[in-house]
């Protein structure tokens, strides 16, 4: 089955926001066996939206449109589908009452502009929105199925997960299984040079996980033996292999498995380590906390770093991250304490310590060691690379010591 995705909105075509909707839909569709042929971002222009719909009808069995279901003048998706497919628009009284009730309960008032959301395609199946006012719609046209979903990511996702995913899954006879392998510190070209030979008889794709490395997705028949394939891949790339999930989730899993706790003392990363980790549900089982000690004064006051240490060696030094790690241990009492201090730039670098220099301190129980790396990129890129480098090394440490 072939699918197309059309995401509407000036905020997409002007680069104001990223198209998370299409990414999510494409991944979910692929997981149940749909082949997404085309993803289109189109501005809030009726003729352009109609053109995208008509092009998609030429090539796809199932079409998803996201955005353009709100109450304003530039919400044009229902009208575009109506005109492209010659489907009437009708007023839905029951839906109108639900929308009025939703807004009254939320704000204590009703706005007449909201009535527009009650005009739907004739004979459409209404897909109730569990987290917002704009419902989704499902219509059939000349052997095609068209879904209209709201633009806000949480609303689109809620409707898809609640009303659509299970139905799509049941409609597909899926005799395939997909494996995902994640790698750190490896280029896509290096991976592909070997994998293209190993996987020549299988369907596979690679993707760059930003600031980390490539991921490899392999699609096989359920009765194919995956183990020999995995062994061949790992015989070449075991030292780069993260696991079958993303780096941060794999780190969380191994901390859970080993029953170890983790804390951070962050300087140049500014809370990025903790922010990335706590995005995982259940992080409180392994993560005790983080201190963002960005200034030298905060390192001294909160982590008991000696003023003389910073004056003699600098804030970005092995000596400083060591004292940061031990100071963190006194406060958090975690099994693993990690400190980070670096120069994210764009200024303050020197010949001895260029922009991108980052020192790490790793304190596991009473064993300490330090690492230094020099990252490239702008300020934000350096901070992100520094974050994932820390995760990779913590993962490696926990595996070697506890698993």
Curated annotation (Swiss-Prot):
CDD domains: cinA (cd00885)
Database matches in SUPFAM superfamilies: CinA-like (SSF142433), Molybdenum cofactor biosynthesis proteins (SSF53218)
Coiled-coil regions listed: none
Domain of life per record: Bacteria
Cited HAMAP family: CinA_B
Cross-referenced PANTHER family: NICOTINAMIDE-NUCLEOTIDE AMIDOHYDROLASE PNCC, NMN AMIDOHYDROLASE-LIKE PROTEIN YFAY
Family, per entry: Belongs to the CinA family.
Protein name: CinA-like protein
């Amino acid at each position: 089955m072939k699918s197309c995705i059309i995401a509407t909105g000036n905020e997409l075509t002007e680069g104001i926001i990223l198209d998370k909707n299409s990414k999510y839909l494409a991944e979910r569709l692929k997981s149940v066996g749909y082949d997404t042929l085309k993803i289109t971002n189109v501005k809030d222009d009726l003729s352009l939206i109609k053109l995208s719909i008509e092009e998609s009808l030429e090539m796809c069995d199932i079409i998803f449109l996201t955005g353009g279901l709100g109450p304003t003048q530039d919400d044009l998706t229902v009208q575009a589908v109506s005109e492209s497919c010659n489907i009437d628009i009708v007023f839905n009284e029951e839906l109108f009452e639900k929308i009025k009730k939703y807004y009254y309960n939320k704000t204590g008032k009703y706005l007449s502009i909201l009535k527009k959301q009650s005009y739907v395609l004739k004979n459409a199946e209404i897909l109730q929105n569990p987290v917002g006012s704009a419902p989704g719609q499902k219509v059939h046209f000349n052997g095609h199925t068209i879904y209209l979903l709201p633009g806000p990511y949480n609303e689109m996702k809620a409707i898809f997960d609640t009303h659509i995913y299970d139905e799509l899954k049941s409609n597909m006879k899926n005799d395939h299984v997909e494996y995902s392998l994640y790698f750190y510190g490896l280029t896509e070209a290096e991976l592909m040079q070997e994998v293209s030979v190993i996987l020549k008889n299988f369907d596979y794709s690679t993707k760059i996980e930003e600031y980390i490395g490539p991921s490899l997705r392999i699609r096989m028949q359920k009765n194919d033996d995956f183990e020999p394939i995995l062994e061949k891949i790992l015989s070449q790339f075991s030292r780069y292999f993260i696991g079958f999930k993303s780096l941060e989730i794999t780190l969380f899993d191994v901390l859970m498995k080993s029953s170890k706790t983790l804390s951070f003392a962050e300087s140049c990363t500014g809370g990025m380590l903790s922010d990335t980790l706590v995005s995982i549900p259940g992080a409180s089982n392994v993560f005790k906390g983080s201190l963002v000690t960005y200034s030298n004064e905060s390192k001294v006051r909160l982590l008991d770093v000696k003023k003389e240490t910073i004056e003699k060696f600098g804030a970005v030094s092995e000596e400083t991250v060591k004292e940061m790690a031990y100071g963190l241990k006194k406060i958090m009492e975690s099994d693993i304490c990690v400190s980070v201090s670096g120069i994210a730039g764009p200024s303050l670098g020197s010949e001895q310590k260029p922009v991108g220099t980052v020192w790490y301190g790793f304190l596991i129980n009473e064993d300490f060691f330090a690492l230094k790396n020099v990252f490239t990129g702008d300020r934000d890129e350096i901070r992100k690379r520094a974050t994932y480098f820390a995760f990779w090394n913590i993962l490696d440490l926990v595996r070697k010591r506890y698993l």
